[in-house]
From Swiss-Prot:
Keyword NAD set for record: yes
The EC number(s) this enzyme carries: 7.1.1.-
Provenance organism: Cutibacterium acnes (strain DSM 16379 / KPA171202)
Subunit text: NDH-1 is composed of 14 different subunits. Subunits NuoA, H, J, K, L, M, N constitute the membrane sector of the complex.
Keyword Membrane annotated: yes
Gene: nuoN
Protein's name in the database: NADH-quinone oxidoreductase subunit N
UniProt record, GO biological process: ATP synthesis coupled electron transport
Length: 538
C-alpha cells in the first residue's frame, strides 16, 4: 500500500501528519507585546488624521515599551528558563537582561525622536522622498509635516533586536538580523540636517550591510553543511567531534563572525561607522551606538560560547587581534576629529575593542568553561549598560546645542557653553568622564569588569593594551571638557544656542546622569544582578 495513503488517528495521511507548532506565550510575551505595538503603530499611520498622528504614535510607542519591560521583568521574576519557539529562541538570563537594557534604551530613544528644539520640527526630514532643496521639500517644511513612521520603524527594529539576542538557531538569527537592519537603513536617510550626507550614509550602510549579511548567510550555510542542523546545540556537538579536522567549521565560523563584528562596529569592519553616525539623524545615531552594538555582542557570545566553544583556540586569538585593532584605530584616529558626531563614532569603535576584551577572556584552562563564560557575559552586560547611559544622555545634549541651520556638531562651536549654561556643562562632564572610564562613573565600572574578565581569562597582555589605549582615548574626551569650559567662541562665528529640553528630555538627562554616578559609586548591586543572569541555555 502507498504509505501516503495511510490514514492516522487525526484523519490525515501519514506523510501530512505534522505536529502543530507550539509557542511558549509566557517567556516570549515581551516579543509579542512589541510586535502587537508595532502593528498598531502601522494602523495609526493609516487611519489617524495627520494632526493627531504624532501624539498618538508617541503614546503607542511609550506604552508598548513600558508594557514590554514589565512583561520582561515578570518573566525574570518567574525564574523559568526554557528554549522556546520550537528551539529557535532561548529567553534565558542573558537574553532577558539584554531585553531590559534594550527596551529601557528604547524609551530614551523615543525622547530623542520626539524632541522638538529650536523650531517646531524634529530631527527628521519633512519629506524624505523629495529631492534635497527642491520646491516640494520647501513646501513640506512650510506645512510642518513630520515623518511619524519613524516610531513603528523604531519598534520593528527593537523587535528584530530582541529576537536576535534570543536566537538559538542560525536561521532565526539571520531573519532577526534583517528585521532590525532594514528599518535602520531607512532611518539613517531621514535626517533634516545635511540631507545629502544623510542619504549617502544610508546608502553606504545599506550596501555594506547587505554585503555583511551575505557573508553571514554564507557562513551559516557552511556551518549547516558540517553540522546538518541550524541549532547551536547541534553545531556544538559537531564541533566537538570534528575539532582540529574540519576546515568547514573554521570557514563558516569566520564568515559568521564577520557579519556580527560588522554590526558591533569593530575594526576592520567599521569603515561605515564614522560616515553613518555623522550623516544619520542624531537620535538614530544614538540608538545605533547602543542597541545595535549590544545585541550583536550578545549574539556573538551565544554563537561562540554555545555553538563554537570547542573551536575556542581558533577564535580567541582572532578576536584578541580585532580588539587591539579596534581600540587602536578608535583611540588614535579619534584624536584628530573636529566633529562631535564623528568623534563619538570613533569612540564607539574604541569601545567595541574594550568590550571585546571581556568576550575574549571567556574560555581558558585557568578559569574553566562555566566560570569564565559567566564572568564574561555579565561583564559585557555591565559595560553596555554603562555605555548606554552615557550615550543616550550625550546624544541628547548634541540635539540641544544648535545654530540657525540645526544642530551644531563642530567641537569648536561648543566653546564656552559650560560657562554660559552650567547645567549642560555639568552633564557634559558626567557623560564624558564615563566614556573615558574615570573612577566614580559607570564607565569605570564597565571597563573594570571587562578587563578583569580578560585578565582572569589569561589575557593579561590584552588588558594592558586596553589600559594604554584607554589613556589615549581619554585625551580626546578631556578635550571636550576643555573646549566647553576653558575656550571662548571665535569672533565672527555664528552664535550657538543651547535649547531647553522638554520635560521628558530633562527626565532622560537626569536619569542617565544619576545612574551613571550610582553605577560608579555603588556598582556591586548591578554587577550581582547581571551575574545571576549570565548563563546561556544550551
Amino acid at each position: 500500500m502507498n504509505p501516503a495513503l495511510l490514514i492516522t488517528a487525526s484523519g490525515l495521511p501519514a506523510l501530512l501528519d505534522v505536529a502543530a507548532p507550539h509557542l511558549e506565550w509566557g517567556p516570549l510575551a515581551p516579543v509579542f507585546v512589541l510586535m502587537a505595538g508595532a502593528c498598531v503603530a502601522v494602523l495609526v499611520e493609516a487611519f489617524v488624521p495627520r494632526s493627531g498622528r504624532r501624539s498618538t504614535q508617541i503614546i503607542v510607542t511609550v506604552a508598548t515599551l513600558v508594557v514590554a519591560i514589565a512583561s520582561t521583568l515578570t518573566t525574570i521574576a518567574r525564574g523559568t528558563r526554557i528554549v522556546a519557539g520550537q528551539g529557535t529562541l532561548a529567553p534565558d538570563g542573558p537574553t532577558l537582561a539584554t531585553w531590559v537594557i534594550l527596551l529601557a534604551t528604547g524609551l530614551g530613544t523615543v525622547v530623542l525622536f520626539a524632541e522638538r528644539v529650536g523650531t517646531t520640527q524634529t530631527a527628521f526630514v519633512a519629506s524624505a522622498s523629495s529631492v534635497p532643496g527642491s520646491p516640494l521639500e520647501a513646501k513640506a517644511e512650510q506645512e510642518h509635516r513630520e515623518h511619524t513612521e519613524v516610531y513603528p520603524l523604531l519598534m520593528f527594529a527593537a523587535l528584530g533586536m530582541m529576537c536576535f539576542a534570543a536566537a538559538n538557531d542560525l536561521i532565526m538569527m539571520f531573519v532577526a538580523l534583517e528585521i532590525f537592519s532594514l528599518p535602520l537603513y531607512l532611518l539613517c536617510g531621514m535626517s533634516r540636517r545635511r540631507r545629502l550626507l544623510s542619504q549617502e550614509a544610508a546608502l553606504k550602510y545599506f550596501l555594506l550591510g547587505a554585503l555583511s549579511s551575505a557573508l553571514f548567510l554564507y557562513g551559516i550555510v557552511l556551518l549547516y553543511g558540517c553540522a546538518g542542523s541550524f541549532k547551536l546545540g547541534d553545531l556544538a556537538a559537531a564541533g566537538v567531534t570534528q575539532v582540529g579536522s574540519s576546515k568547514l567549521i573554521v570557514a563558516g565560523m569566520i564568515l559568521v563572525a564577520v557579519g556580527l563584528l560588522f554590526k558591533i562596529g569593530a575594526v576592520p569592519f567599521a569603515s561605515w561607522t564614522p560616515d553613518v553616525y555623522t550623516g544619520a539623524p542624531t537620535p538614530v545615531s544614538g540608538w545605533m551606538a547602543v542597541a545595535t552594538k549590544l545585541v550583536a555582542l550578545v549574539g556573538l557570545m551565544r554563537v561562540l560560547y554555545v555553538g563554537l566553544g570547542a573551536m575556542r583556540w581558533d577564535w580567541q586569538i582572532v578576536l584578541a587581534v580585532v580588539a587591539v585593532a579596534s581600540m587602536g584605530v578608535g583611540a588614535i584616529v579619534g584624536l584628530a576629529q573636529t566633529d562631535m558626531k564623528r568623534l563619538l563614532a570613533y569612540s564607539a569603535i574604541a569601545h567595541a575593542g574594550f568590550v571585546l576584551v571581556g568576550v575574549v577572556g571567556a574560555w581558558t584552562t585557568q578559569t574553566g568553561m562555566a566560570e569564565g563564560q559567566t564572568g564574561s557575559v555579565s561583564s559585557v552586560l555591565v559595560y553596555m549598560t554603562a555605555y548606554g547611559l552615557a550615550s543616550i544622555g550625550f546624544w541628547l545634549l548634541i540635539l540641544m546645542v544648535r545654530r540657525a541651520g540645526g544642530e551644531s556638531t563642530e567641537i569648536a562651536s561648543w566653546a564656552g557653553i559650560g560657562r554660559s549654561h552650567p547645567w549642560i556643562g555639568v552633564l557634559v562632564v558626567i557623560f564624558v568622564l564615563s566614556f573615558a572610564g574615570i573612577p566614580l562613573t559607570a564607565g569605570f565600572t564597565g571597563k573594570l569588569v571587562v578587563f578583569l574578565a580578560g585578565w582572569r581569562g589569561g589575557y593579561a597582555w590584552l588588558v594592558l593594551i586596553g589600559v594604554l589605549f584607554s589613556l589615549v582615548a581619554a585625551a580626546f574626551y578631556l578635550r571636550i571638557i576643555v573646549v566647553v569650559f576653558f575656550r571662548s567662541a571665535k569672533e565672527g562665528d555664528d552664535p550657538v544656542e543651547v535649547a531647553e529640553p522638554s520635560i521628558a528630555g530633562w527626565i532622560t538627562l537626569i536619569v542617565c546622569a544619576v545612574f551613571t554616578i550610582v553605577m560608579g559609586v555603588a556598582p556591586q548591586p548591578i554587577i550581582d544582578l547581571f551575574n545571576q543572569a549570565s548563563t546561556f541555555l544550551r
